[in-house]
UniProtKB/Swiss-Prot annotation:
Biological source species: Dictyostelium discoideum (Social amoeba)
Domain of life where this protein originates: Eukaryota
Enzyme class: transferase
GO molecular function, one term: protein serine/threonine kinase activity
Keyword Electron transport among record annotations: no
UniProt keyword annotations, A-Z: ATP-binding, Coiled coil, Kinase, Nucleotide-binding, Serine/threonine-protein kinase, Transferase
Reaction(s) catalysed (UniProt annotation): L-seryl-[protein] + ATP = O-phospho-L-seryl-[protein] + ADP + H(+); L-threonyl-[protein] + ATP = O-phospho-L-threonyl-[protein] + ADP + H(+)
FHA domain location: 46-100
Descriptive protein name: Probable serine/threonine-protein kinase fhkE
GO BP terms, alphabetized: DNA damage checkpoint signaling; DNA damage response; mitotic DNA damage checkpoint signaling
Family statement drawn from the similarity comment of this UniProt entry: Belongs to the protein kinase superfamily. CAMK Ser/Thr protein kinase family. CHK2 subfamily.
Pfam family, one: FHA
Biased composition (Polar residues): 669-678
Entry's Gene Ontology cellular component terms: nucleus
């Protein structure tokens, strides 16, 4: 035994030890007044009073004739002693200084004090009631320890004074009733031994020490280090609140004890002033504080979390309140929240969260709604209040740990609060910048893809390997166009000098057929002319020599009958560049079908034109490059069809020329009364690819006649 423990000794009457060991009855009353002897309880009914026929006779006039009686009501087979005391007195019978009341009875427990006289009486007649149960035969604590008065009581456990019979050293014995304990449905089978297993592996001056364990079928008895100065809560209440210096001294000992637990991976989970005991009043000693009541403690391994709703509401961390809702549980941080609430009480005398407010206590905790009333906190330093704020932090990841507490300005004079606050502000701004950057990246990646040209291409639609493109299109020119034909990303012609391939049609012919009355015929020195408007019915064609290398003729569509549409459904578009230029969307022209039929009926193909353009009256169109966009008709069988305005125009087949003698002759559209589209009275042109039409989409089948369409 250490010196401090040895100091807690009691002069034990050897007769008491002998009487308990030699008693033949079921209990004993140990007299607290040397003038009166001990009483062995042998009979099942023992009477006390001034009457001569009383089992225990008294001559004191303060004792009634029939003062009280003690009865034993138990089964000898199970060895459990159940005893009651009945009060028949005028002046009263007292159990632990509480009056039973005339005509009432009280259940007796080992270690209780029975007094037959009021406290104000000079001569006290009192006894300590002690049962001799079967646990002595089973190796219980009563064989080694004298069980004395009650020190505390809980739902399923009582704490009593225990005196070692051979040495007289005083301890505390915590007696747990197993039956009551397991009536709690949430208790695990092995949970009863949690406190035992945890305490056995601990040794710290600020943690209660376990001395010995006794267990039988009915009770679990823990012999613990005795702490005689009571609970921290009672001391705070008696002082109203602590001075900041006293609070700092005691709180540091609490932190040291909790830090020791956390380093071993143990969470107390029920830290509160009631579970913190004072060993002595010399607070400057490092063992003045003792953490106790580890019944709710759990060992937390790395990466694991606890999910049980436990603890006292005023000291519960927010994550405990939400742990039963499917969240990730909680860890050691819950003890730090509880320490914040304890420090708050130490400095002002009342808890930070209270049921008496309009907002529920759980809502207060979830949102950390507490305040520092100037009336009570004006004399408290900003460092102390700042530490409380950091402990009562809703986010457990940002909450201060025990190591952080020790390095806080309230404990560490080398750290200034202003420096700490500046660092907080820097981290806050950094976090905001990171969040803003992440939001920008998210918005950019989630923004809809707009049709347009890559900025990196600087106006060139073709992803060609030729660096001799002379026709670059300015950004303002792109923005001014009301129609846009996307160009293929990859061109197989490395010497196209700006030659562009339209994405919207495998034949590179735009399917926008416009009735333009003032279309200009241009003499282009660059093959970057997409001939988007080559399929126009022109009435007044002027011959202009235009040397602009990137003339797409797209602006001519602004003067047409609003047949333009920039909504291409080409499924072969592989452009993944995020940086696109948004162009205005053109509404669908309701006359697109009639324009299509007019074009099919009026269009003539000039087989002698080596450039194979399909314009109607553009005989003066002098292109100096034979690799015209219409050469892309060879891709008809290799590319998927596109859709514009939900119409599916048939690309014109090649006419036999010198360069392509095997080209098929043009097929004139045929009208058929067989209307597969379901629109009665409207004749449809025959598909030029029938019966080998590769366009299998429903819209095309409805717009063009097929002799074998039923098989498509």
């Amino acid at each position: 035994m250490d010196e401090l423990t040895q100091a807690n000794t009691l002069a034990i009457d050897e007769d008491l030890v002998d009487s308990v060991n030699s008693v033949k009855g079921w209990g004993i009353l140990k007299s607290l007044n040397p003038s009166y002897p001990d009483i062995s309880l042998v009979e099942n009914v023992i009477t006390f009073g001034r009457l001569k026929d009383s089992t225990v006779h008294y001559n004191d006039k303060s004792i009634s004739g029939s003062h009280c009686k003690i009865t034993r009501e138990s089964n000898d087979d199970d060895g459990v002693v159940i005893a009651f005391i009945y009060d028949n007195s005028t002046n009263g019978t007292f159990i632990d200084n509480i009056k039973v009341g005339k005509g009432s009875r009280c259940l007796l427990a080992s270690g209780q004090e029975i007094s037959l006289t009021p406290q104000k009486q000079l001569e006290k007649i009192a006894y300590i009631f002690q049962t001799v149960e079967k646990e002595i035969e089973d190796g219980g604590p009563s064989n080694k320890y004298f069980i004395g008065e009650m020190l505390g009581q809980g739902n399923f456990a009582t704490v009593k004074l225990a005196v070692e019979r051979t040495t007289g050293v005083k301890y505390a014995v915590k007696i747990v009733d197993k039956k009551k304990y397991f009536m709690n449905s949430s208790a695990r089978k092995d949970s009863l031994m949690d406190e035992v297993n945890i305490l056995r592996g601990l040794s710290h001056p600020n943690i209660i020490q376990i001395i010995e364990v006794f267990e039988n079928e009915k009770v679990l008895s823990l012999i613990l280090e005795l702490v005689e100065c009571g609970e921290l809560l009672n001391d705070i209440v008696s002082n109203l609140f602590y001075t900041e210096d006293k609070a700092k001294t005691l709180f540091r000992q609490i932190v040291d004890g909790v830090l020791y637990l956390h380093n071993k991976g143990i969470a107390h989970r029920d830290l509160k002033p009631e579970n913190i005991l004072l060993k002595h009043k010399n607070f400057n000693q490092n063992d003045a504080i003792k953490l106790t009541d580890f019944g709710l403690s759990r060992t937390v391994s790395d990466g694991s979390f606890m999910k049980t709703m436990c603890g006292t509401p005023q000291y519960l961390a927010p994550e405990i309140l939400t742990s039963s809702g499917g969240h990730n549980g909680y860890g050691l941080e819950v003890d730090c929240w509880s320490m914040g609430a304890i420090l708050y009480i130490m400095l002002c005398g009342y808890p930070p969260f209270d049921d008496s407010r309009e907002v529920s206590i759980f809502e207060q905790i979830r949102n950390a709604k507490f305040e520092f009333d100037p009336e009570d906190w004006s004399s408290v330093s900003e460092e102390a209040k700042d530490l409380i704020k950091r402990l009562l932090c809703v986010d457990p990841h940002k909450r201060y740990t025990c190591n952080n507490i020790i390095q806080h300005p309230w404990f560490n004079p080398n750290v200034k609060l202003s420096t700490l606050l500046e660092e907080d502000e820097r981290l806050r701004k950094k976090a905001e910048a990171e969040v803003e950057a992440n939001n920008n990246n998210t918005n950019k990646s989630n923004s809809p893809k707009m049709l347009g040209k890559r900025k990196s291409e600087d106006g060139n639609c073709s992803d060609s390997n030729n660096n001799n493109n002379s026709g670059s299109k300015s950004l303002s020119s792109i923005k001014s166009n009301t129609t846009m034909l996307d160009c293929d990303e990859k061109s197989n012609n490395n010497n196209n000098n700006g030659h562009k391939k339209s994405k919207s049609d495998p034949t590179s012919n735009n399917s926008l057929f416009n009735n333009d009355n003032n279309n200009n015929n241009n003499n282009n020195n660059n093959n970057n002319n997409n001939n988007n408007n080559n399929n126009n019915n022109n009435n007044n064609n002027n011959n202009n020599n235009n040397n602009n290398n990137n003339n797409n003729n797209n602006n001519n569509n602004n003067n047409n009958n609003n047949n333009n549409n920039n909504n291409s459904n080409d499924t072969t578009d592989s452009d993944t560049d995020d940086e696109t230029i948004s162009l205005p969307v053109i509404t669908k022209n309701s006359k697109s079908m009639s324009n299509l039929q007019n074009h099919l009926n009026n269009n003539k193909i000039n087989s002698d034109d080596e450039s194979e353009t399909s314009t109607n009256n553009n005989n003066n169109n002098n292109n100096n490059n034979n690799n015209n966009n219409n050469n892309n008709n060879n891709n008809n069988n290799n590319n998927k069809p596109s859709t514009i305005n939900n119409n599916f125009p048939v690309p014109f087949p090649k006419s036999p020329t010198k360069n392509s003698p095997n080209a098929s002759p043009p097929i004139k559209p045929q009208n058929s009364s067989n209307n597969n589209s379901g629109l009665a009275g409207i004749d449809k042109p025959k598909c030029q690819y029938d019966p080998n039409c590769y366009r299998k989409n429903p819209q095309h089948l409805r717009d063009f006649y097929h002799t074998v369409s039923s098989n498509k």
